[in-house]
Regions:
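Interfacial helix-cap and linker-helix signal at transmembrane-aqueous boundaries
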Residues: 36-37, 68-69, 160-166, 240-241, ...
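Central cavity-lining transmembrane alpha-helices of secondary-active solute carriers
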Residues: 49-67, 257-269
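Primarily marks hydrophobic transmembrane alpha-helices of the MFS/SLC 12-helix fold
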Residues: 75-78, 283
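Cytoplasmic helix-loop-helix junction between adjacent transmembrane helices
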Residues: 109-145
């Protein structure tokens, strides 16, 4: 009798949980910025540093992952990633209120869960790309939509929890969020792992990737996508409160929550209708919208218009990250873990640099986040130029992946 074929649906579902874990890691702590400033005396520059530590740690893991993940194996590495995320969230909830220097405790917790976040980012995309699927670009976009739904859930649940139990209850909430990576550990423990590089395809080394101009273009696109996405997302809550003058509950729900909703909608649309859409055309039109919304958020004096611009920025950046992954996998099928790791490095660089630049520019201009976002519009402008170059030199009219 022939062996039963592995059921990779469980694997893909576990990857969805992995991206929800990543969303909790990246989006829970920024909701506490105003609380940290008021109760712990942490200024905007040091708050900006917290974001940077998170994404730079993930960046370092991304760099190293290409060297050790294939050697150790995907299953032990993805489980270890969720264990680190679990430990970091528990540390965030338990340590800051129990030590003399809460800022150092927060930094330590961020470092722990960022180790897990970096591994998750590197691994879930190639796992889903390797799982059998008729339209891989659609599957990739759907995977990344779960980051958005995770972000939306993180913001909405956290906001309602803090409203119901008070902002002082945030340590309890941090411990409750640790349930998500615990679920991921259980799911990946029983999930089969696919072959990452297609059978019969040679695995590309760094020397092979470095000889391909398309790799550098994809790297720059990922850099800009991360900066444009997180430059708005990480500061949306604080921008709504301080820049637009709305309450914290309204600011969190209409700022980062609406951003996540629209980003998830964009990715889900392509995840469902991707076989009917041209990927590069979708990215190009989204880039134009991104530029317009950054400028609107920075220049408007109307709170409603500013919140709308923030939300539509989420829609505009939604396809950038998964779309670039799909384009790269199509152009370099032998890229494997190394290619995804290097592209994740570019994305992490953008995620770290984007909000840091916005925060530093704001700090240098009287803590004006409007000025920071105005400067941040350059991320979307550069991204638009990359998309135009990609359409001309890389894929042109791209067919759906099979």
């Amino acid at each position: 009798m022939s062996a039963t074929a592995p059921n990779y649906n469980h694997t893909v579902t576990a990857c969805f949980v992995g991206y929800i874990t990543q969303a909790v890691i990246n989006n829970f702590m920024p909701l506490l910025f105003v609380t940290f400033a008021a109760t712990l005396g942490i200024d905007m520059a040091r708050l900006s540093a917290l974001i940077t530590v998170n994404f730079v740690t993930q960046l370092v893991v991304d760099v190293l992952a290409g060297k050790f993940v294939d050697r150790i194996g995907y299953k032990p590495c993805i489980i270890a990633a969720h264990l680190a995320a679990l430990a970091g969230l528990l540390a965030l909830g338990l340590l800051p209120t129990r030590v003399p220097d809460p800022y150092l405790a927060i930094l330590a917790a961020i470092f722990l869960y960022a180790l897990g976040g970096g591994l998750i980012e590197v691994m879930v995309s190639p796992i889903v790309e390797a799982c059998p699927s008729e339209h891989k670009a659609k599957a990739m976009s759907l995977l990344h939509s779960f980051y958005c739904w995770g972000q939306l859930g993180t913001v909405a649940i956290s906001t309602l929890f803090l409203f119901a139990f008070g902002t002082g209850s945030w340590p309890v909430l941090a411990c409750l969020w640790a349930i998500v990576p615990a679920i991921g550990i259980a799911m990946f423990a029983g999930a089969p792992m696919p072959r990452i590089v297609p059978e019969g395809t040679a695995t590309m080394r760094f020397a092979d990737l470095s000889k391909k101009p398309v790799f550098y273009l994809m790297f720059l696109m990922m850099l800009c996508a991360g900066a444009a996405e997180q430059g708005m997302s990480q500061w949306a809550s604080a921008f709504a409160e301080s820049g637009l003058g709305v309450t914290k509950v309204i600011g969190d729900l209409a700022g980062p929550a609406a951003f996540a909703l629209m980003m998830g909608l964009s990715r889900t649309i392509y995840g469902v209708l991707g076989h009917r859409l041209n990927l590069t055309a979708f990215i190009a039109s989204s880039s134009v919208l991104c530029v317009a919304m950054y400028l609107t958020a920075a220049l408007t004096t109307a709170p409603v218009l500013g919140l709308l611009a923030c939300a539509l920025t989420g829609f505009s950046v939604g396809i950038m990250w998964p779309g670039t992954f799909s384009m790269a996998a199509d152009a370099m099928p032998g890229g494997g873990t190394l290619m995804f790791a290097l592209l994740a490095v570019a994305g992490a660089l953008g995620c770290a640099g984007g909000p840091a630049v916005v925060g530093l520019v704001a700090s240098a201009n009287g803590d004006s986040l409007k000025t920071g976002l105005l400067f941040g519009s350059m991320f979307a402008l550069v991204l638009l130029a990359c998309v135009v170059a990609a359409r001309k030199t890389v894929v042109g009219e791209r067919e759906p992946l099979h």
